[in-house]
Amino acid sequence: MSEMQDYSSSLEDVNSRKFETFSYLPAMDADRIRKQVEYIVSKGWNPAIEHTEPENAFDHYWYMWKLPMFGETDIDTILKEAEACHKAHPNNHVRLIGFDNYAQSKGAEMVVYRGKPV
């Protein structure tokens, strides 16, 4: 069995901070993000975009970018909204969420653009 790898994360080192499961993997490129959006759409979940300042990522609510995209199935539209949020708030973290109507919870959540650490 291979050795367990330590994923150090500390508040002092802003570049080591982890947000969710995907933050322990290499950064997602545009193709991998697109596949995640395809997965959200294939599950019938409602996508939404949120953003926040890096210093508030852990102890504050994130701001909703517009309204959740209820019933949106066009992957390009969802990706354009995430990009528009990033362009409007270039220093903020931007995350994509898939809301599951059946379970009435988040089915997926991932940071798609990392903000500039302070």
From Swiss-Prot:
Signal peptide start-end: none
GO biological process, one term: reductive pentose-phosphate cycle
Induction: Expressed when grown photoautotrophically (at protein level).
InterPro entries: RuBisCO_ssu, RuBisCO_ssu_dom, RuBisCO_ssu_sf
GO MF annotation list: ribulose-bisphosphate carboxylase activity
Keywords in alphabetical order: Calvin cycle, Carbon dioxide fixation, Photosynthesis
SUPFAM superfamilies reported for this sequence: RuBisCO, small subunit
PANTHER family, alphabetized: RIBULOSE BISPHOSPHATE CARBOXYLASE SMALL CHAIN 1, CHLOROPLASTIC
Chain's role: RuBisCO catalyzes two reactions: the carboxylation of D-ribulose 1,5-bisphosphate, the primary event in carbon dioxide fixation, as well as the oxidative fragmentation of the pentose substrate. Both reactions occur simultaneously and in competition at the same active site. Although the small subunit is not catalytic it is essential for maximal activity.
Subunit architecture: Heterohexadecamer of 8 large and 8 small subunits.
Other known facts: The basic functional RuBisCO is composed of a large chain homodimer in a 'head-to-tail' conformation. In form I RuBisCO this homodimer is arranged in a barrel-like tetramer with the small subunits forming a tetrameric 'cap' on each end of the 'barrel'.
Assigned protein family: Belongs to the RuBisCO small chain family.
Name of the protein: Ribulose bisphosphate carboxylase small subunit 1
Organism: Allochromatium vinosum (strain ATCC 17899 / DSM 180 / NBRC 103801 / NCIMB 10441 / D) (Chromatium vinosum)
